[in-house]
Amino acid sequence: MPLSLSNRDQNSGHLFYNRRLRAATTRFSVRMKHDDRKQTAALALSMVLVAIAAGWMMLLNVLKPTGIVGDSAIIGDRDSGALYARIDGRLYPALNLTSARLATGTAGQPTWVKPAEIAKYPTGPLVGIPGAPAAMPVNRGAVSAWAVCDTAGRPRSADKPVVTSIAGPITGGGRATHLRDDAGLLVTFDGSTYVIWGGKRSQIDPTNRAVTLSLGLDPGVTSPIQISRALFDGLPATEPLRVPAVPEAGTPSTWVPGARVGSVLQAQTAGGGSQFYVLLPDGVQKISSFVADLLRSANSYGAAAPRVVTPDVLVHTPQVTSLPVEYYPAGRLNFVDTAADPTTCVSWEKASTDPQARVAVYNGRGLPVPPSMDSRIVRLVRDDRAPASVVATQVLVLPGAANFVTSTSGVITAESRESLFWVSGNGVRFGIANDEATLRALGLDPGAAVQAPWPLLRTFAAGPALSRDAALLARDTVPTLGQVAIVTTTAKAGA
């Protein structure tokens, strides 16, 4: 008898009948609102995933067993958090992670194990660098920016300025602005008087009336403020502003009949303006209105005004540049009221693609950063520094500021790359030995270090030098280093 084979529709109906019968017996309903096939598939998939995860964990346990020292160079105690440097099969307690990395010569992470695992190994004395940072994250800022600021005390007082060192670009923050080209600040340092103008400082003699009159300065009205050595060293300097010494001054000129050497000449320009010249033995030199006033204030040779000459006289007279006055101001200065605007800063900025740095002077009623950054200011403990110290009173490291640097000079055209430093978030600079073993252990590339001017960089607190040799020094205990201060807590302050 031939077989009676079922077709596709019969099979589907039979399976449907079985599912409906199963639903009726298990759920007491034949409406089949829930598909058992999907639940079965999900359960099977879950079991497969669990099996895969369990197998992966077993494989990891074989390849890298948890809680076993193995070949790890840096070991950490799970319970206490203590770190050990594994050297020649012996575990040496390390002061911090940076010291452990330097001592072992590796930049790896600690392997955390139980105390029982550590007890299996012989131990040695304490190694490491006291005060070294626990971690050294590197911020590669687009611009290397540094500043030092003085906030002056009361006018005519002996109050010393509060010095703030800033790492990171400054924007003014609504409290300070660039010192205008026609503005000046009268300051004193170490018994001498200076004028800060045009991003630089120039020494003056306040008793020289020719200089003060030409500057627009009345010493009886404008009082100088004392500046710190940090700000003084950070400002580019010019030669002193004094009356230029003109050779053979007062002798008759061979170029302009009736005029004397050292006298000031004035010529009208095509645009209706005036250009000043000083008559020298070998010709005439173009000068600014400030230098013209300065020369005439010293000796006008009886003339009430500069002698006006026609352009043809200048054409037939040699143009020279023998008088060194190129660094003098262009005109009179408007002196800042330091009682209203007591904060003065010098900033240094340079991007990696810049041919030279940019130096600027800021002045205003407060630090040139947003007020929201004031809470990030760290007051350094070393407030009892010597008078000649350049260490700041307080520091501010702005978010994202470049912190792996190589020192260079304060000259804007400086291209040197000298010592390596890493600056912490609390304003401590750590010198880094420029050798392969140290750099490899710290995971640093000296080529990635950005330039930073040493006159500003040295105002940050000095931390210990970081090197592999220093990290391998063994000791029984750590003596107290540097200055200390008591941290005042809220509970203690209210007691």
UniProtKB/Swiss-Prot annotation:
One Pfam family this sequence matches: T7SS_ESX1_EccB
Keywords: ATP-binding, Cell membrane, Hydrolase, Membrane, Nucleotide-binding, Transmembrane, Transmembrane helix
Protein's cellular compartments: Cell membrane
Topology class, membrane: Single-pass membrane protein
Domain of life: Bacteria
Transmembrane segments: 43-63
Family: Belongs to the EccB family.
Functional note: An ATPase.
Identification of the protein by name: ESX-2 secretion system ATPase EccB2
Origin organism lineage: Bacteria, Bacillati, Actinomycetota, Actinomycetes, Mycobacteriales
Gene label: eccB2
